[in-house]
Amino acid sequence: MFCTFCLKDRNYYMFKLFKDYWPTCTTECQICLEKIDDNGGIVAMPDTGMLNLEKMFHEQCIQRWRREHTRDPFNRVIKYYFNFPPKTLEECNVMLRETKGSIGDHEIDRVYKRVYQRVTQEDALDIELDFRHFFKMQS
């Protein structure tokens, strides 16, 4: 059997992992306090460059808040608002480039911090193998 491995850059891999891990995490909108669903939400990056995924918002909630207030609900000066998980690779690239670190001690922050550190700092190679194209699925 002949196998071909396609190695992608770390940002692409992080983009994929952000989406893959999202359904395993839960957080709530810090404005309406309802659960953020599987489609994700908005995370604000303060001028410190530190992400805190526990402090996320529904898109509609933060849009309404921003129309009525000059600062975010935690009185931070916000540099960027990102979809999380990122909707595009380009958005993921900007978020990764601008992020200086991650803060927060809730489970969602710990999960993504571990994933980020593993992909960006460890000397390891992750290879994704998809054998569905090679083997017929039995009914």
From Swiss-Prot:
InterPro entries: Baculovirus_U-box/Ring-like (IPR008573), Znf_RING/FYVE/PHD (IPR013083). Transmembrane segments: none annotated. Pfam families: Baculo_RING. Its main location: host cell. It comes from the Viruses. This is Protein AC53. The keyword Manganese does not apply. It is found in: Host cytoplasm; Host nucleus. GO terms for cellular component: host cell cytoplasm; host cell nucleus. Keywords: Host cytoplasm, Host nucleus. The gene is AC53. Plays a role in nucleocapsid assembly.
